[in-house]
Amino acid sequence: MKVNDIDMDAVILGNGEYPTHSMPETMLIMAPYVVCCDGSADEHIRRGFTPDAIIGDGDSLSPENKERFRTIFHQIDDQETNDQTKAVHFLLDQGKKTIILVGATGKREDHTLGNISLLIDYMKAGAQVTMLTDHGMFIPASGRNCFKSYPGQQISIFNFNATGLRADGLVYPLSDFSNWWQG
């Protein structure tokens, strides 16, 4: 997959590990609109970039950047959702539906698992979301889908209640898995 194969309205930078692989790093640089999740703005700004918006409860954003970027900082104190979810809904409210998530993994495994698991919720909310990491990508899907691939590419399918799974050209057959991690 190449950078120009991915369409996007915006990129959300999570507060996990800052991207180092060229794919998520390039997406972040080329993005037409960048939303930083709370404290991720500190690292993004330190690297010489200015986000279009900073979203979160403000618990990890430095006081200096909170003040300096107060016009683009949207503080949402709700503790029932994480900052990534707040950022997705912020973008959906603006009509930005094709969203790339970067920096959403690493540092904390509980946040990594949570952020990956939330992709299904974002899809159900109307977002066309792709999570790019330094090691791969996650794409939530429903219904009939076709994905570009190449011989030898590693592919994992996490099944969240789908039935009748079918694929052509995979080494291992698909079935209606009983657990999400089996694919």
Would you name each region that the model predicts?
Residues G136, A141-G183:
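Long, charged alpha-helical interface segments
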Residues F73-G95:
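Short phosphate-binding loop-to-helix
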Residues T71-D77, Q128-T130, S156-F158:
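A glycine-rich helix N-cap at a beta->alpha junction
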Residues D110-I120:
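Short Gly/Thr/Asp-enriched flexible loops that form oxyanion-binding sites at enzyme active sites
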Residues M1-R68:
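N-terminal beta-strand-loop-alpha-helix module at the start
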Residues D121-F138:
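Short, acidic/small-residue loops that bind anionic groups at enzyme active sites
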